[in-house]
């Protein structure tokens, strides 16, 4: 099973937990979690932090196939996170990203608010 530690390498946290930021605590919590077990919240945060974007795409596709408006804090949060990536972040998973794009473009217009519509437009402009 692939984890962030296997992808990034061994990262030594030198701070005591009470000295760590919430981001550091989160990263320490998920670094050994298999990518296929990451939650929607973890995927959103990892994408926003630009962590292993390419390797996360199969899990993102799996989640969005089951729940196209997946989000921990609001509907469409995962789509919003995807709108922040750059085409160069996608190396081996360009076809997976294309599938993700096709999937979100099939959402019913009545299910999409203005912010989500803007995020989808950004995703459609990502060159792969």
Swiss-Prot record:
InterPro entries: CdiI. Pfam families: CdiI_3. Disulfide bonds: none annotated. Interacts with cognate CdiA-CT but not CdiA-CT from D.dadantii strain 3937. CysK forms a complex with CdiA-CT/CdiI. One CdiA toxin subunit binds to each subunit of the CysK homodimer, and one CdiI immunity protein binds to each toxin subunit; the immune complex is thus a dimer of trimers. Immunity protein component of a toxin-immunity protein module, which functions as a cellular contact-dependent growth inhibition (CDI) system. CDI modules allow bacteria to communicate with and inhibit the growth of closely related neighboring bacteria in a contact-dependent fashion. Protects cells against the tRNA nuclease activity of CdiA, its cognate toxin protein, but not against CdiA from E.coli strain EC93 or D.dadantii strain 3937. Binding to CdiA-CT in the CdiA-CysK complex probably blocks the tRNA-binding site of CdiA-CT. This is Immunity protein CdiI.
């Amino acid at each position: 099973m692939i984890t962030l530690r296997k992808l990034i390498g061994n990262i030594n946290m030198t701070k005591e937990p009470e000295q760590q930021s919430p981001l550091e605590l989160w990263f320490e919590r998920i670094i050994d979690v298999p990518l296929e077990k990451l939650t929607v919240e973890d995927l959103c945060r990892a994408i926003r932090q630009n962590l292993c974007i390419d390797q996360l795409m199969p899990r993102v596709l799996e989640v969005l196939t089951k729940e196209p408006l997946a989000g921990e804090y609001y509907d469409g949060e995962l789509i919003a996170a995807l709108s922040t990536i750059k085409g160069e972040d996608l190396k081996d998973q360009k076809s997976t990203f294309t599938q993700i794009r096709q999937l979100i473009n099939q959402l019913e217009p009545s299910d999409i608010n203005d912010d989500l519509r803007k995020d989808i437009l950004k995703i459609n402009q990502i060159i792969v």
